[in-house]
From Swiss-Prot:
<dbReference type="Pfam" id="PF03462">
    <property type="entry name" value="PCRF"/>
</dbReference>
<dbReference type="InterPro" id="IPR050057">
    <property type="entry name" value="Prokaryotic/Mito_RF"/>
</dbReference>
<protein>
    <recommendedName>
        <fullName>Peptide chain release factor 1</fullName>
    </recommendedName>
</protein>
<comment type="function">
    <text>Peptide chain release factor 1 directs the termination of translation in response to the peptide chain termination codons UAG and UAA.</text>
</comment>
<feature type="modified residue" description="N5-methylglutamine">
    <location>
        <position position="233"/>
    </location>
</feature>
<dbReference type="InterPro" id="IPR005139">
    <property type="entry name" value="PCRF"/>
</dbReference>
<keyword id="KW-0963">Cytoplasm</keyword>
<keyword id="KW-0488">Methylation</keyword>
<dbReference type="InterPro" id="IPR004373">
    <property type="entry name" value="RF-1"/>
</dbReference>
<dbReference type="GO" id="GO:0005737">
    <property type="term" value="C:cytoplasm"/>
</dbReference>
<dbReference type="InterPro" id="IPR045853">
    <property type="entry name" value="Pep_chain_release_fac_I_sf"/>
</dbReference>
<dbReference type="GO" id="GO:0016149">
    <property type="term" value="F:translation release factor activity, codon specific"/>
</dbReference>
<dbReference type="InterPro" id="IPR000352">
    <property type="entry name" value="Pep_chain_release_fac_I"/>
</dbReference>
<dbReference type="Pfam" id="PF00472">
    <property type="entry name" value="RF-1"/>
</dbReference>
<keyword id="KW-0648">Protein biosynthesis</keyword>
<feature type="region of interest" description="Disordered">
    <location>
        <begin position="280"/>
        <end position="310"/>
    </location>
</feature>
<comment type="similarity">
    <text>Belongs to the prokaryotic/mitochondrial release factor family.</text>
</comment>
Length: 355
């Protein structure tokens, strides 16, 4: 089917769905049709913009050929033709991008996990910096950032930390943050002024709902124990800490942040559900491994994706060769959009080239 034929088919489907919704259907049929109609809305707007510009260009070219025009009118028509000829490829690209297969998880909220990697206490301090950076970015985007768990070192660093980030299309924006983030800076305790390199790992998981992942009680082993502080001492006299193991996969989540065992269990289940959903997605993607060759990075947590060099004031994303000399804006204020938009655009370009 040609590109033009495909556009006609989509417009026809959208029109028929509109008529169907107006006919008084109810129940599951109405819900299904409403969902399909809403999913087509964005691409239909882009198709109509493309068709309008294409029609206007054709009319302008015909007018130029068929009419006797004075110089002023001819110049005006030529300018209009030039503008439309530049606009049309951009509108066509926008249509093609909107027709790309959608990641079913893109519209979901996300769970982000940050873990200190190599580099000792400096790595833990960097993990805290990253976690706070994502919190600032979430506030900037108007998302709700809920801390799930923090394992701190007692002097400002985080061994690991996780949060739930709720909002529209959160996962689509943050999914490229998964991987190894490296920092180069001079630690406050470094008397010789030497630059140290350390790392932290970020994992971004789509937040799963009950309809995405069904967890049977028989598949869970739940252990409770007393919460301990940074030095290992017990900080609670009740068994409020919870460790949940999903027996079929061996995936384990332990949580002790809340004083309530019930709250710790609820948060642990949320993280477990997200990890199981991500594992399900990973297996599906492995089956379609050929389609992943063109993506920007693999999302592999072992892949080094970005370097934060404090002495030089730069942040470099190695997947798209983008360097910004604005480390304070990025790290302290969470201004990540320039990286995120470039990563999304590059991913779309790779996918378009594979069509």
């Amino acid at each position: 089917m040609s590109f033009s034929d495909n556009l006609v088919k989509i417009l026809d489907k959208y029109e028929n769905l509109g008529k169907k919704l107006s006919s008084g259907i109810i129940g599951d049929e109405f819900v299904k049709a409403s969902k399909e109609y809403a999913e087509l809305e964005d691409v239909v707007v882009k198709i109509k913009q493309y068709n309008k510009a294409k029609s206007e260009l054709e009319e302008a070219n015909n007018f130029r050929l068929e009419m006797a025009l004075d110089n002023a009118t001819l110049e005006m028509i030529d300018n209009e033709i030039h503008t439309l000829e530049n606009l049309l490829p951009k509108l066509e690209r926008a249509v093609r991008i909107s027709l790309l297969p959608k990641d079913e998880a893109d519209s979901k909220s996300a769970i982000i996990e940050v873990r200190a990697g190599s580099g000792g206490e400096e790595a833990a301090l960097f993990a805290a910096v990253l976690f706070n950076m994502y919190q600032r970015y979430s506030e900037f985007k108007g998302w709700r950032f809920e801390i799930l768990a923090i394992s701190d070192t007692g002097i400002g660093g985080y061994k690991e930390a996780s949060a739930s980030i709720k909002g529209k299309d959160v996962f689509s924006k943050l999914k490229f943050e998964s991987g190894v983030h490296r920092v180069q800076r001079i630690p406050e305790t470094e008397s010789q002024g030497r630059i140290h390199t350390s790392a932290a790992t970020v994992a971004v998981l789509p937040e799963a709902e009950g309809i995405d992942i069904k967890i049977e009680d028989k598949d869970l082993r739940i252990d409770t124990y007393r919460a301990s502080g940074a030095g290992g001492q017990h900080v609670n006299t009740t068994d409020s800490a919870v460790r949940i193991t999903h027996i079929p996969t061996g995936i384990t989540v332990a949580l002790q942040d809340e004083k309530s065992q019930h709250k710790n269990k609820a948060k642990a289940l949320k993280i477990l559900r997200a990890r199981l959903y991500e594992e399900k997605r990973r297996q599906k993607e492995q089956e379609r491994s050929d389609s992943r060759r063109g993506q920007v990075g693999s999302g592999d947590r072992s892949e080094r994706i970005r370097t934060y060099n404090f002495p030089q004031g730069r942040v470099s994303d190695h997947r798209i060769n983008l360097t910004l000399y604005k480390i304070d804006e990025v790290v302290k204020h969470g201004q990540l959009d320039e990286f995120i938009e470039a990563l999304i655009a590059n991913d779309e370009a790779k996918k378009l080239s594979e069509l």
